[in-house]
């Protein structure tokens, strides 16, 4: 992530807020921190709505109650707490995500699956934080990058 690159991407865009997505590894969390700092920078000034931890754990199809933390445990959860930001969701690695993608069927279609439940929880969290943001901050405007 670079401030200059991000300025080019968001210039002339109306951005309600940013959602930072990361995996739980320390190196990925370092990049997530940079992303948070970039959006909160005075030149960009985009509110952070929250964090999403992708690949939070692996759950095998045969043992859906088991969780294997392949990339570390609660990395985004801890970062969210440290940065005083909401953790919007922890999305597991589930074999069905890959299979559904290969078949062209959204993984969330099977409403009983852990994947669908994770994405539904994420969607509900996003609605909550956007409503909260809209209640306490001015209406979304086109981002004007301050080059001072």
What spans do the regions from the language model cover?
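Alpha-helical transmembrane segments of multi-pass membrane transport proteins
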Residues: 6-7, 33-36, 40-43
């Amino acid at each position: 992530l670079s401030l200059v690159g991000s300025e080019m991407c968001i210039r002339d865009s109306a951005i309600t807020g940013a959602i930072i997505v990361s995996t739980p590894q320390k190196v990925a969390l370092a990049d997530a921190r940079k992303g948070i700092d970039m959006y909160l920078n005075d030149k960009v000034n985009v509110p952070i709505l929250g964090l999403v931890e992708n690949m939070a754990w692996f759950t095998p199809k045969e043992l859906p109650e088991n969780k294997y933390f392949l990339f570390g445990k609660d990395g985004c959860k801890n970062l969210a707490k440290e940065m005083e930001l909401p953790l919007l969701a922890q999305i597991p690695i589930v074999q069905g995500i890959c299979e559904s993608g290969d078949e062209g069927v959204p993984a969330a279609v099977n409403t009983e699956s852990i994947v669908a439940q994770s994405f539904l929880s994420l969607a509900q969290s996003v609605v909550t934080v956007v409503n909260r943001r809209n209640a306490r901050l001015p209406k979304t405007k086109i981002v004007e990058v301050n080059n001072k």
